[in-house]
Amino acid sequence: MNDFETNIERCYLGIIPIKILKGRLNFKDTSDYLFAKELLKIAESLKNSDAVHLAFLIFDDYVLQEEDFGLLDIFFLDWHDAHEDIVFTVSKIRNCNLVEFFKKAINFIPSYMAEDDLHAIARKAFFGLGTNINCSKSLEYLNNYANSSAIVLKKFAIEQLEFLSRK
């Protein structure tokens, strides 16, 4: 493990704050948002899962901007274990351009979650579809899943439709 990775891990574990990590990685004068984007570059080059987690923790505070939605491609890679963090962070963003991401995320199962009977990623992706219910495709996908034979996914879709009908 190199110094970058050690410092990233220590930050992810809460041992050092993000501000200190930024200084140690020579990003002291960079905004937290831009630093999160840099963390994703570091994550990809080093295949460092902790850096992905940290980046999306930062995006959770600063809201991933539409021009950066391409960064979500990292979600579909299997070398990290930050899939739940990514979809959770993004599920709170209202933007019709995210609907296809949520649809794909529902059916994506990373190898380390192959035995996940709770379908944690899919559930969070359904929250994202619910957040974007005003988008025609989101409503279409929720209705399609609500009428599907996939019991768990059907349940998640119905849950979102019922929740949203009470608003």
Regions inferred by a protein language model and the residue ranges of each:
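Short inter-helical turns and helix N-cap capping residues of alpha-solenoid HEAT/ARM repeat scaffolds
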Residues: 78-79, 110, 118, 149-151
